[in-house]
Structures are given as structure tokens and as C-alpha cells.
């Protein structure tokens, strides 16, 4: 049976889905029609109910909980690896009210954290996550929220840290930050959903072996 699978280009996703996509493991008769996209595109597709299985920002899950359920494998939960708010020029948190801020998507966990900790930051502009650093460097935006590899390379590009949103989450909650989930459509019957769960778990275990 062929299922529509949508994942991001993030190394986390390619790492854990490689085995099932390339049949390095038993997929129990499942085949996959793969789409790779930016996380905000994945969120939008899930909001439209399109994929059978998809990566999704945890911040978006309440919007699709009637159509999708979270699988027990594949979630990105972490400490010390959350989104970073950065700027080119010195910028204090109390100056964010008037700042133009690049974000990786309206429905991303990164944007939800920004809204939670800096509700006064209202001038938000959506960019592809990989273009955010350049938007700040070119002064198209005063600040930007970096995710994925951008959080590890920003200093080398001449950007400076304004706030570590993941660290702030951990300080306030003492919990790991829920970044992304793998969800399965409620269109799939219970038996098929359990098969997907087993295959994904097997793929993750293969990746770590």
C-alpha cells in the first residue's frame, strides 16, 4: 500500500526515515510517495489534511488534532537546541516592539515561542528558514529566529544572540522543548496506523544501530 509521506530536509528527518524509504528494513508491505519540503509548507499541508504521514511543528498540532494523531516514534524533543533570536546590530529585548523580525513560518514552534516570550514583537515576516540569516545581514529585517543548522553557524556570519528561546522555555518549564512531531492521518484505520508506527520505530532503530 502506498502512503503519502511528507518530511523536511532537516538531517533529523533524513536520518530516521532513510531505512524505511530505501527498504533497508521490513516495511510490512508499505510503500511511500515522498514529499520533502520546508517545515511551514509541511504545516500548511497538514492543515489542509493532505499527507497520510507528515512531520509537523508541535505548535501546529492543536490545529490538526481532529485529523492527525502523534506517533510514538520520531518526535524532536530536546534541550539546548531550541530556536535562537539573533540580530546584526546590538538589539535589546525591549526594542523588539518596533523591530522587523524574520520567522520561519506562522505555525512553527519557533514563532509560537517568540509570541510567548516576546508578545510585543508584532512585525513578523515569513522567510524560508535558510534565508533568515541573510535577511538579517542585509538589513531587510532587524532580527530573525533561526532553526536547524542556522543556530550553529550564526556567529561566523557576524550575527549576535538576542535571546535563546529554547533556553527560556527550559528555564520556565524545566521540560525539554517539543519541536517537531511525526503524525499520521486519522483517515488510516487503527491497524494501518499501528503498522506505520512499527515501521517508523524500526527505521529509527536501524538509524541508531
Short names for language-model regions:
Residues 63-65, 114, 153-156:
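Short loop/helix-cap segments at secondary-structure boundaries that form the rim of catalytic
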Residues 46, 55, 126, 144-146:
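A structural signal for short, well-ordered beta-strand segments and their strand-loop junctions
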Residues 128-209:
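Pocket-lining segment of extracytoplasmic ligand-binding domains
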Amino acid at each position: 500500500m502506498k502512503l503519502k509521506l511528507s518530511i523536511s530536509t532537516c538531517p533529523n528527518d533524513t536520518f530516521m526515515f532513510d531505512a524505511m524509504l530505501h527498504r533497508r528494513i521490513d516495511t510490512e508491505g508499505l510503500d511511500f510517495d515522498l514529499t520533502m519540503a520546508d517545515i511551514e509548507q509541511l504545516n500548511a499541508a497538514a492543515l489542509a489534511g493532505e499527507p497520510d504521514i507528515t512531520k509537523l511543528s508541535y505548535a501546529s498540532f492543536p490545529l490538526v488534532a481532529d485529523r492527525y494523531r502523534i506517533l510514538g516514534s520520531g518526535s524532536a524533543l530536546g534541550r539546548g537546541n531550541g530556536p535562537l533570536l539573533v540580530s546584526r546590530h546590538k538589539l535589546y529585548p525591549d526594542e523588539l516592539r518596533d523591530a522587523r523580525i524574520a520567522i520561519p513560518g506562522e505555525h512553527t514552534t519557533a514563532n509560537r515561542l517568540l509570541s510567548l516570550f516576546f508578545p510585543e514583537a508584532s512585525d513578523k515576516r515569513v522567510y524560508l528558514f535558510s534565508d533568515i540569516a541573510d535577511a538579517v545581514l542585509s538589513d531587510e529585517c532587524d532580527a530573525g529566529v533561526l532553526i536547524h543548522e542556522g543556530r550553529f553557524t550564526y556567529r561566523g556570519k557576524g550575527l549576535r544572540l538576542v535571546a535563546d528561546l529554547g533556553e527560556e522555555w527550559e528555564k520556565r518549564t524545566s521540560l525539554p522543548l517539543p519541536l517537531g512531531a511525526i503524525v499520521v492521518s486519522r483517515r488510516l484505520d487503527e491497524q494501518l496506523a499501528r503498522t506505520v508506527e512499527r515501521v517508523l520505530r524500526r527505521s529509527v532503530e536501524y538509524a541508531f544501530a
